[in-house]
Amino acid sequence: MNRPVGTPNFDGSFVVPAEVDTDDVDNFELGWKTTLLDNQLRFNGAAFFIDISDLQTTIFDPSIVNLFFSDNAADAEVIGVEGDITYAPEAFQGLTINGAFSILDSEITEVLTPTGDVVEGDELAFAPTFQGNLRARYEWDVKSNALGEDLVGHIQPSIVYSSASNSDILQFNTDRVQGYTQVGLALGVSSDNWSGEIYANNLFNSSGELSRAFGNDRQRVTPVRPRTIGARVAYNFR
């Protein structure tokens, strides 16, 4: 129930509704799972179309009322493809490459709230056009240690990327969420019972943002974690 129910905008073309309708989402998806190159390559994925009707949102528009209210603001569509890949080449024993990606094309197709706060053709909030990650792990045998255990060493570089996106569908609330690229590196050794690893996440200390939100006249930003260097040790008490 909206507290400022019945409040009109300046020309009377819009009145804050007493309640909002349930938004509806229809999702159509075609997926696949494949194994190629004599089981060296696995590629799974899906293509999808999402039809959103009566998208709910919370609006703060001082030209109408100095209170937040909810409304069915727009209809929208999302077309996308996502997938994950694992490649373990026989010609390079010990190497495994993993990756995943997401491609989105989102759009406001019809504006339902005649206040000018939502614009047809804009993308949806927090819907980056492309996101992806890639990780390569190489393992090799290490000579037995003083306890007579056979050890396995590994090195694992990785990269994560996200393009920029909008923080809201409302014009006066929205801001651009900064995209980012992060590189990581890990080096370690393991046996049947224990493992140890040193790692560096966001190796080059790149900037970026996970989210933005507007509240109390301020943009509140959640940044990506800065460069983090650490060590992990695990033991299996079996």
Regions found by a protein language model. Name each.
Residues D51, V160-D168, G188-R238:
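C-terminal beta-signal and adjacent terminal beta-strands/loops
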Residues F49-D51, D71-N166, R232-R238:
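Gram-negative outer-membrane beta-barrel transporters
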Residues V25-E29, Q40, A76-D84, A127-N133, ...:
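Transmembrane beta-barrel architecture of outer-membrane proteins
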Residues P4, D21-A88, S102, S106-E110, ...:
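Membrane-embedded beta-barrel scaffold of Gram-negative outer-membrane proteins
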Residues N2-S13, F126-S190, N201-F204, F214-D217:
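C-terminal beta-barrel architecture of Gram-negative outer-membrane proteins
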Residues D38-F43, F92-I97, K143-A146, N193-I198:
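Repeated loop/turn-to-beta-strand initiation elements of outer-membrane beta-barrel proteins
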